[in-house]
């Protein structure tokens, strides 16, 4: 019968090899790499959670007829439900302007845009897909509050690609009213820090996302679809 060595008969070196300084250094490097990855992972999760929470808060306020200040694909804006007359009138009151100058409606994608204005021509698709924010004035849109329309029944609509405003439109499932976050006649704020305290106090909620954006933004270009489908650039 073969002799079987008992567990305690083996030399400790079999199970506990010599640990060198190099081994310790490798472990330290690995731990540093892992801790850096873990911290980055947690930070990304925190940012994602913050983004989602702000979306939920803004969507809740807007869906209940409230008015928000929020980042858009151009300058910071005052927003509301484009289909709700009462909400639109609140925006006019905050900006101290009459309803003679209608608001812009933001949409999340081409599908939402076509639900409001009907099928898009190839030329219009090219415009709204442009990297540069482009507001298009459409004739006789559907589903918008009367206060969102100009005197001739047209409406200014822009497809946003900015993450927050785009996802907010999707959460609402309909266009989001937008106008610059300023009192009528005052300069347009290029950053959040440029918005007056009066505006921030007047809205029902101010989005926390995007406040630290340092780079200034400019207004969009504006294109009107004239009779016969001709495109007229109002602001380039």
Residue ranges with predicted function:
Residues 9, 14, 24-27:
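Short hydrophobic alpha-helical segments enriched in small aliphatic residues
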Residues 43-236:
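Active-site-adjacent structural elements in enzyme catalytic cores
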Residues 2-5, 47:
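Basic polycationic patches enriched in arginine
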